[in-house]
């Protein structure tokens, strides 16, 4: 538990007042509000599509829906934290002793934000594990119960890691918002970010290996349609998860790089801008927005591929039926022609001489 800082200030400094009322901060909140609205709208569209079209296995479907829900909750929680900060900055723009937050009032929201971020990552890992289970044995049936169990496990892991990361508790420091804690050790923050990246990188590697295995297995049993369809379904699901995890690594990696750059250039950026620049470096909101976009795009691609395969099979079947029909017609015509127009040769007359 952190101890109180002797002589801590309960009122904002002049620099903090400038940062709290800056356009750089306000525009960031407005931008993230727009991103949240887009995320929620696309999530509704995706959920309706997933409900009406059978594209993913049951377990993967449960986990994808859970991932969409977690992303939407993250957008709501982060939006609440930032809009609360914006409201206070607008109402108390000229009252330095009321415009700031303390860690005791922010601690529940700060902890919840860390938990939801961990749950985002752990849910992705659960999807990867689900894919590996299916790819290890195509005969294993994908059930909704398995998806629910994996999601519950991801919740338990997120709770445990979150409790470890926030075990020091709140202190008496002032904060400009309930998203970031001021006065934290830089090495601790860097380690936290790297843990996120390590977990996602491992999940991406495992999913890539699984996708390669399923692609290789698809080359076998080409004449077993049921096995081919099951394997193709596994490839489609793995490919969607891979695309999603790649986007997560891009955004979270970018967040880590930007935070590292801010730490190194904090003296150049200046105390007036550092806090608000960090807000613009937060890319989790973009990661949440890209999940429904990736699912929409991938389902569209999968649907087009299915349609092409169906059209190809239908055309092949039609050609086969037409060929069979004309072959049969040809045989029938030949037989009919032979019977009808066979030369009329008189039967030989056999004479029997009687003696």
Curated annotation (Swiss-Prot):
Is Ribonucleoprotein set as a keyword in this record?
A: no
Task: State where it is primarily located.
Answer: membrane
Please name the InterPro entries in this protein's record: 7TM_GPCR_serpentine_rcpt_Sra (IPR000344), Nematode_rcpt-like_serp_alpha (IPR051080)
Superkingdom to which the source organism belongs: Eukaryota
- Membrane-related topology note: Multi-pass membrane protein
Lineage, please?
Eukaryota, Metazoa, Ecdysozoa, Nematoda, Chromadorea
Family from the record = Belongs to the nematode receptor-like protein sra family.
GO terms (BP aspect):
detection of chemical stimulus involved in sensory perception
Subcellular location, in the record's words?
A: Membrane
Quote one Gene Ontology molecular function term.
G protein-coupled receptor activity
Keywords from the named record: Membrane, Transmembrane, Transmembrane helix
Q: What protein am I looking at? A: Serpentine receptor class alpha-34
CC terms in the record's Gene Ontology section: membrane
Keyword Metal-binding part of the UniProt annotation: no
Q: Where are the transmembrane segments?
A: 27-47, 61-81, 109-129, 147-167, 193-213, 243-263, 277-297
């Amino acid at each position: 538990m952190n101890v109180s800082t002797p002589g801590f200030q309960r009122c904002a400094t002049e620099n903090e007042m400038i940062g709290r009322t800056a356009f750089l901060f306000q525009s960031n909140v407005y931008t993230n509000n727009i991103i949240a609205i887009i995320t929620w709208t696309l999530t509704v569209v995706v959920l309706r599509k997933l409900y009406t079209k059978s594209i993913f296995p049951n377990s993967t479907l449960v986990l994808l829906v859970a991932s969409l829900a977690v992303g939407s909750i993250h957008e709501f929680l982060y939006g609440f934290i930032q809009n609360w900060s914006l409201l206070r900055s607008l109402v108390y723009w000229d009252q330095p002793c009321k415009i700031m937050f303390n860690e005791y009032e922010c601690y529940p929201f700060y902890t919840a934000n860390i938990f939801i971020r961990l749950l985002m990552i752990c849910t992705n890992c659960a999807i990867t594990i689900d894919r590996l289970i299916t790819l290890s044995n195509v005969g294993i049936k994908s059930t909704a119960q398995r998806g629910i169990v994996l999601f519950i496990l991801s919740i338990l892991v997120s709770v445990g890691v979150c409790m470890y990361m926030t075990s020091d508790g709140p202190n008496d420091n002032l904060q400009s918002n309930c998203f970031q804690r001021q006065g934290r050790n830089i090495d601790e923050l860097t380690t936290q970010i790297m843990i996120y990246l390590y977990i996602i990188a491992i999940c991406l590697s495992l999913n890539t290996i699984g996708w390669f295995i399923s692609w290789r297995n698809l080359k076998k049993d080409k004449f077993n349609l049921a096995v081919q369809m099951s394997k193709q379904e596994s490839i489609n699901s793995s490919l969607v998860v891979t695309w999603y995890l790649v986007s997560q690594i891009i955004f979270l990696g970018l967040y880590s790089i930007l935070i590292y750059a801010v730490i190194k250039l904090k003296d150049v950026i200046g105390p007036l801008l550092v806090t608000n620049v960090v807000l613009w470096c937060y890319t989790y909101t973009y990661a949440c927005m890209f999940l429904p976009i990736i699912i929409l795009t991938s389902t569209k691609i999968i649907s087009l591929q299915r349609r092409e395969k169906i059209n190809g099979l239908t055309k092949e079947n039609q050609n086969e039926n037409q060929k069979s029909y004309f072959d049969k017609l040809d045989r029938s015509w030949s037989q009919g022609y032979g019977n009808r127009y066979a030369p009329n040769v008189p039967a030989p007359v056999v004479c029997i001489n009687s003696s």
